[in-house]
């Protein structure tokens, strides 16, 4: 039986560092919000069977998303952290029968709206049948410095270091178990949760264009990338 590929977009964050008057996933770039750009990527991809967005219970912007993408499931059961939001989304997928334990969940940042289709294809093709799952990532290119009191304390050897991106693909059952802990402190992405179970996810070559909208100046680069598509 073919595994389903389900995109899960945690969008309950408020994006404090971005400094806008609304959560950054709802900032408009061009004629669409960041989140709408993200959803378009998954809705256009032939290998993605279902897309789910998990937002905060207090979210007042999600209705516009639902109107623009009526086929997307928008659930208002987000948590206080990304890990809690993903946990709640995966749990509901399993409880409702929309996902089986062996189906693939592709967790993607709501602020990464320039994900190239070919990178998504590569992740699904190379990690979609792997029990350990996998994530998009790129080798660290810049020299890394360790800081202490505003000064360099050491230069970090970057050999073997990769910068994690999203989507991060794992079977629903594995991801559910990985996020079942009551205390999710220190879980910054799905791979880190899975690693705590002793699983070693695959690293799949990502793409430099798949940047995360974090600081206000990132919006300029994102506009250029979206206009180039």
Curated annotation (Swiss-Prot):
Transmembrane segment boundaries: none
Chain positions of site Transition state stabilizer: 17, 24
Coiled coil: none
Keywords from the named record: Isoprene biosynthesis, Nucleotidyltransferase, Transferase
Pathway(s) annotated for this protein in UniProt: Isoprenoid biosynthesis; isopentenyl diphosphate biosynthesis via DXP pathway; isopentenyl diphosphate from 1-deoxy-D-xylulose 5-phosphate: step 2/6
GO biological process: isopentenyl diphosphate biosynthetic process, methylerythritol 4-phosphate pathway
Catalytic reaction equation(s): 2-C-methyl-D-erythritol 4-phosphate + CTP + H(+) = 4-CDP-2-C-methyl-D-erythritol + diphosphate
Protein source organism: Neisseria gonorrhoeae (strain NCCP11945)
Molecular function as annotated in GO: 2-C-methyl-D-erythritol 4-phosphate cytidylyltransferase activity
Gene name, Swiss-Prot/TrEMBL: ispD
Domain of life, source organism: Bacteria
Pfam short name (any one): IspD
EC class name: transferase
CDD domains assigned: CDP-ME_synthetase
Chain's role: Catalyzes the formation of 4-diphosphocytidyl-2-C-methyl-D-erythritol from CTP and 2-C-methyl-D-erythritol 4-phosphate (MEP).
Protein name: 2-C-methyl-D-erythritol 4-phosphate cytidylyltransferase
Site keyed Positions MEP for the nucleophilic attack: positions: 158, 212
EC number(s) from the headed UniProt entry: 2.7.7.60
Family assignment from sequence similarity: Belongs to the IspD/TarI cytidylyltransferase family. IspD subfamily.
């Amino acid at each position: 039986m073919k595994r389903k590929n389900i995109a899960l977009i945690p969008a309950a964050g408020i994006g404090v560092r971005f400094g806008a008057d609304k959560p950054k996933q709802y900032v408009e770039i061009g004629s669409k919000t960041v989140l709408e750009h993200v959803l378009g990527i998954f809705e256009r991809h032939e290998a993605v069977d279902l897309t789910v967005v998990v937002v905060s219970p207090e979210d007042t912007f999600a209705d516009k998303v639902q109107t623009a993408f009526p086929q997307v499931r928008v659930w208002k059961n987000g948590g206080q952290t990304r890990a809690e939001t993903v946990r709640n989304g995966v749990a509901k997928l399993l409880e409702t029968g929309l996902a089986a334990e062996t189906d693939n969940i592709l967790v993607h940042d709501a602020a990464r709206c320039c994900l190239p289709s070919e990178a998504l294809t590569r992740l699904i093709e190379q990690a979609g049948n792997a029990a350990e799952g996998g994530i998009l990532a790129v080798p660290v290119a810049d020299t890394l410095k360790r800081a202490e009191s505003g000064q360099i304390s050491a230069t970090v050897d970057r050999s073997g270091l990769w910068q994690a991106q999203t989507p991060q693909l794992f079977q629903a059952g594995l991801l559910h178990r990985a996020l079942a802990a009551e205390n999710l402190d220190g879980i910054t992405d799905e791979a880190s949760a899975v690693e705590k179970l002793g699983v070693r996810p695959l690293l799949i070559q990502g793409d430099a264009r798949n940047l995360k909208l974090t600081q206000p100046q990132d919006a300029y680069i994102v506009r250029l990338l979206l206009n180039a598509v």
